[in-house]
């Protein structure tokens, strides 16, 4: 039966046998708790089952493991949007700090004629724009119920990496001010890394994209 036999359940807090082992201490997103949970002889009522108890091997049944995987087509654009937003906030604050330091940034002039700091900033802006457009496309397809697995993975891969690169780049451009807790740049840099990891790492996204483009199954391309 394999994956078709995997089912999802709701296990309420306080159910006997369910124990929170520990709260993780993380690099970022510290306001969002992450915990390890252990189940020891935890009895879950049948009515807590999500979906049908039958094992349905038909493609697109949307239950169990397949249903869980299908949710990524909607959640990956959301994570991409979080990364895009985090990067945008960093860029806006960095531009303000650079201008206060006397760095002129001209969006209408070639980068080779501008200062090194301005040229680097404009490169980060360019990377952000690509992530933003991919995120819009994948989200629009999800909203309109169009198949978007490839686009969702592309947006997640691009925006996740750009979010991390841009926020770190902004910390670097702002020097000691960016690295200190004086402003939010260091926090955004820490928070953004998880957006490059959860909902599927870079390696997972690239594998999914390759399978879709080449028309290969998960058993044919691992």
Feature roles, as predicted:
Residues 1-84, 88-92, 205, 215-222:
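FAD-binding core of flavoproteins
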Residues 62, 71-222:
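Alpha-helical interface subdomain recognition
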């Amino acid at each position: 039966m394999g994956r078709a036999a995997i089912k999802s359940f709701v296990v309420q807090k306080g159910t006997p046998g369910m124990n929170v082992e520990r709260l993780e201490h993380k690099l970022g997103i510290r306001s969002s708790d992450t915990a390890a949970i252990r189940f020891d002889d935890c009895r879950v009522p049948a009515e807590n089952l999500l979906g049908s108890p039958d094992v349905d091997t038909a493609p697109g049944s949307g239950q169990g493991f397949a249903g869980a995987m299908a949710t990524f087509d909607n959640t990956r654009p959301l994570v991409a949007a979080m990364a895009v937003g985090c990067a945008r906030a960093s860029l806006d604050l960095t531009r303000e700090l650079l201008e206060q330091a006397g760095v002129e940034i001209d969006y209408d002039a070639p980068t080779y004629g501008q200062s090194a700091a301005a040229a680097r900033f404009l490169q980060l802006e360019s990377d952000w724009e690509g992530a933003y457009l991919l995120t819009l496309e994948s989200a629009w397809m999800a909203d309109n119920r169009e198949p978007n697995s490839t686009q969702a993975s592309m947006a997640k891969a691009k925006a996740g990496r750009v979010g991390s690169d841009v926020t770190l780049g902004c910390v670097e451009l702002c020097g000691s001010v960016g690295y200190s807790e004086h402003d939010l740049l260091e926090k955004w840099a820490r928070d953004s890394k998880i957006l490059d990891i959860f909902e599927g790492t870079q390696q997972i996204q690239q594998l999914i994209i390759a399978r879709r483009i080449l028309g290969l199954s998960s058993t044919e391309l691992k």
